[in-house]
Amino acid sequence: MAKEIKFDMESRDLLKKGVDALANAVKVTLGPKGRNVILSKTYGAPHITKDGVSVAKEIELECPFENMGAQLVKEVASKTNDDAGDGTTTATILAQSIIGVGLKNVTAGANPMDLKRGIDKAVKAVVTHIAGMAKEVGDDFQKIEHVAKISANGDENIGSLIAEAMRKVKKEGVITVEEAKGTDTTVEVVEGMQFDRGYISPYFVTNTDKMEVQMENPFILIYDKKISVLKEMLPILEQTVQTGKPLLIIAEDIDSEALATLVVNRLRGSLKICAVKAPGFGDRRKAMLEDIAILTGGTVISEETGLKLENATMDMLGTAEKVTVDKDNTTIVNGAGNKEGIASRITQIKAQIENTTSDYDREKLQERLAKLAGGVAVLYVGAASEVEMKEKKDRVEDALSATRAAIEEGTVPGGGTAYIRAIAALEGLKGENEDETTGIEIVKRAIEEPLRQIVANAGKEGAVVVQKVKEGKDDFGYNARTDVFENLYTTGVIDPAKVTRVALENAASIAGMFLTTECVIADKKEDNPAAPAMPGGMGGMGGMM
């Protein structure tokens, strides 16, 4: 396919049109008075959102050169979302500002490479200043609530629910977001270890009202293969029956014949038993079975380690205070595992989380860590309609990410104030030449933009508010929700330092690449000729039988 090539100013101007198209759509969502953006969907109802990255992901422009510009800024939003989970709109605004002012200077003859060096120098100084301003969150759940509330566009209910979930599962715990059946948003905590496998047969149920198997102080048999014939496990079954305690079997699968025998004995009342399939797949299944064994003080019966089911003994079985099994999940509460063994396993999983490069693997490892360490909290998001549900779920996920970021690197005053305070770090900073110093000035101007936009979205005059915030010091800033200048820390208008840092770093990175671009190549549009008209003389064919 033929290519179209653009150089110099022409290429950069087209890219900038794309940047502006995307940034202008995204930036209206910023702040507590941010506006909604409605996204059309091919199927189903439109999606209403205030989430910057959701808006950015929808934008595709017709002109391939403009579209490249939009995709560059989309990359800023996506990367910021991946790194910090929030701050996508702020990053987009910063990128647009650095690119816009930078481009004017390049047009006026500034050296793009020197500008980039100046921009990088300024960003480094601002990041250091932000780190110095950050205040640790620690176990201050009020701060956690404030951060979550701000990120959820001022929704106090979401803020308090996330703080409650954090309080219950601690830092190691996992918090997942799911859609609720009703209209209420609630948080539920699963104590102990839960995995997503239910009973193999409903005939194991002991509580028919709830359709659950409930076991008190059961033995737990963990086997990593399929149980084909019951004869293999008869010795261990007989020993368990003699104790009078229930038995939970966790195995890869159970053959229908062996299952039928277990069910018949369960219905007769001679066996208190339940069988579930092992969680996970492949190597992850082996690791999860090992986790269960460590948590319950049992041993995984595996031929790989030389253990056979027919030779299993009672000391290979795990135990727990309580086990609940429904059709979808199995929950093991207060496993009788050795505390040191569990601590050692937790350390091992943490090391694997540090070393993994796959986001999916990291997520699964964190789930395993939570199940061993802190438990799992589920936030059920309820709403009156599907459209509202999606919008609310976006906000809950943003708030959750922001909260985690705050715990990691602390908090700074919100509402764009942290950037205004960081201007002080650039006051005496000079580059090695005039263009580098211009690069520093570009960043100094750009970091005012988030506050200007928050103010503009609230219907006020940006320049006036920015000047007044500059005149104050420390945590003094503008609360756009209440239209009041005040100490932002005391009123809970705070942002995670990590989000503030990552947004600027990613924006500057893409802007630097943009300013040093000299040539853009895209596929040439092919003009498809119109289909030829039907030849005449075909009209009489209607009469054919």
Swiss-Prot record:
Q: What class of enzyme is it?
A: isomerase
Record note on quaternary structure: Forms a cylinder of 14 subunits composed of two heptameric rings stacked back-to-back. Interacts with the co-chaperonin GroES.
- InterPro entries, per this entry? Chaperonin_Cpn60_CS, Cpn60/GroEL, Cpn60/GroEL/TCP-1, GroEL-like_apical_dom_sf, GROEL-like_equatorial_sf, TCP-1-like_intermed_sf
Q: Its GO CC terms?
A: cytoplasm
Name-wise, this protein is Chaperonin GroEL
What are the TM regions of this chain, as residue ranges?
Answer: none
Q: List the disulfide bonds.
A: none
NCBIfam families, sorted: GroEL, PRK00013.1, PRK12849.1, PRK12850.1, PRK12851.1
Residue positions annotated to bind ATP are T29, L30, G31, P32, K50, D86, G87, T88, T89, T90, G415, D495
Similarity field: Belongs to the chaperonin (HSP60) family.
Which subcellular locations apply to this protein?
Answer: Cytoplasm
What's the EC number here? 5.6.1.7
Q: What does this protein do?
A: Together with its co-chaperonin GroES, plays an essential role in assisting protein folding. The GroEL-GroES system forms a nano-cage that allows encapsulation of the non-native substrate proteins and provides a physical environment optimized to promote and accelerate protein folding.
Q: Which SUPFAM superfamilies match?
A: GroEL apical domain-like, GroEL equatorial domain-like, GroEL-intermediate domain like
UniProt keyword annotation of Cytoplasm present: yes
- A Pfam family for this UniProt protein? Cpn60_TCP1
State any single GO MF term: isomerase activity
Q: Which organism is it from?
A: Porphyromonas gingivalis (strain ATCC BAA-308 / W83)
Q: Which UniProt keywords apply?
A: ATP-binding, Chaperone, Cytoplasm, Isomerase, Nucleotide-binding
**What GO biological process, any one, is recorded here?**
protein refolding
CDD domains (UniProt xref): GroEL
Q: What is its main location?
A: cytoplasm
**Which reaction(s) does its UniProt entry say it catalyses?**
ATP + H2O + a folded polypeptide = ADP + phosphate + an unfolded polypeptide
- This chain is encoded by the gene named groEL
